[in-house]
């Protein structure tokens, strides 16, 4: 949620990374089932990028994939299906045509990615002398695992943390996810966000990117501090197959609200890179602009193989991805057999 890194994590982190390894030995981790979608929330637009690098044009919005023109951010309705060619199939069987995004997008550091270009290796960097605010933007902390064999799904639980003590228009994202280690096009993400839709509040939504340069998300749903969130990504194919379609659900078990992307395409990717938990932020200039409780814990993390069975041995890595200019706060990542705790 643009891509914040363009090489395998250890190579990307560099001297600022803090790397911890944990061996996870577990089978039969309980996972949450699919919940029914019950609400009819409004569909607000993502937050304007007020704190973006100076070369990002006015009017662009923040997404978990970087900065996009608002016309290239699409809401997929509750009964709709996002097809592999970018069209949207509606409940009545009709299909909306796919329109490629005609605008460049920008990574969290301000690198420009032209329409039709992949996010790797990172786009055109900002011109010399372009101002970058002294703040944290992009991936901050992550727990991840890569295997040569593809995965069949992942799920994790976490609680909605406290709102930030200081509201400066910043955006916070928390999520597990799946990505293709060798073919970085997108990442499937069930996301909890604060101010993700210009609302200065907590919401959940499920995301996929970037067919035709567009970024797609499900209808966001409001949630509250203390609610139990379940993020679940499941391949929509038979056991033993590498799925081309996926269901992404972000579920509030406390309220019953669910925000789901159904049967969304893999866009030709094979998901062999898993994230137990990630903190991604935009516009953070001080420690009191993070969630005021200072941490998020992802628990009951369950990674599935292509047979849709729980993987009994996972070598999780925990990484701190500190950036130049980030405020000095209580950063840390701790991996336990079934959880990832991220502090800030």
Role assignments for model-derived ranges:
Residues 1-11:
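N-terminal secretory signal peptides that target proteins for export/translocation
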Residues 2, 29, 49-50:
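Intrinsically disordered, low-complexity cationic segments
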Residues 10, 28-29:
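Intrinsic disorder/low-complexity segments
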Residues 15-28:
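Bacterial N-terminal signal peptides
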Residues 22, 31-33, 38:
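Cleavable N-terminal signal peptides
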Residues 36-344:
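Exposed, interaction-prone regions of secreted/extracellular proteins
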